[in-house]
Amino acid sequence: MSKIKELFESGKFKSAFIPYFTLGDPNYNDSIEFGKTILDGGADILELGIPFSDPVADGPVIQRAVARSLKNKFSFDEIFRVTKQIHLHKQETPLVYLTYFNPIYHCGITKFLDNAKDSGVVGLVIPDLPFDTIESETLFQELRLRDMDLIHLVTPASTKKRIEALRKTSTGFIYYVTSFGVTGERREFSVDLKERIRFLKDTIQLPICAGFGISTPEQASQIAGYADGIIIGSAIQRVIEENGQDASKAKNVLADYITKIRASIS
């Protein structure tokens, strides 16, 4: 049983809290400290973003974070070292990479997965993963060999045919994109969000975690009433962006925000 499957079956929470931030922003050491702060604040799963030059699914806040990380020339070796330091701080909390396929392909699928697993990563979210290619089939097989999860994104535009295809290779949980467009904070969500999540639960029979746009404790609490998990990225990245020049202040503001979100969905 994968670590993520075990977590969702444990009954430890009403809805999982899955924060996200981009590795390497604003620098190597602060990435480690921010990761530790988020874990201490009550993350059930921590999603770590690997910087890539063409983050097509990301909104402006995360795009700027990625740009800062790339400006630092954050290497694969540094990504894996930072990840391991975060993992060692709280080894019981699953870590997941959000990455585009190009970095995996560039590194080499087996090399990337070996290093990721050694660093404490138990699953991948790949927004632009191609289907029905030799590379994707290799990735599916190599993930299964390592008991690592492949977490697919489902959007409001996903067809039944697409959802059925995703069901065959999805493990861990489904990342449900709450609204059209890229990542970023939003004031309102679709009126049929609750029904859509229930449909996915019945169809795919995996935990459904909602992300894209959630930023306030009130939003998190509302959606946690019917989603198995809440994913928050842009709001966390904004805290880092606005306070990153003062690491101590950033940690305090981040800790306060994470604690409030965690309390809202407990």
Curated annotation (Swiss-Prot):
It is an enzyme of class 4 (lyase). One of its GO terms (cellular component) is cytosol. The alpha subunit is responsible for the aldol cleavage of indoleglycerol phosphate to indole and glyceraldehyde 3-phosphate. Belongs to the TrpA family. Signal peptide: none annotated. GO terms for molecular function: tryptophan synthase activity. The gene is trpA. The lineage of its organism: Bacteria, Pseudomonadati, Spirochaetota, Spirochaetia, Leptospirales. Tetramer of two alpha and two beta chains. It catalyses: (1S,2R)-1-C-(indol-3-yl)glycerol 3-phosphate + L-serine = D-glyceraldehyde 3-phosphate + L-tryptophan + H2O. This is Tryptophan synthase alpha chain.
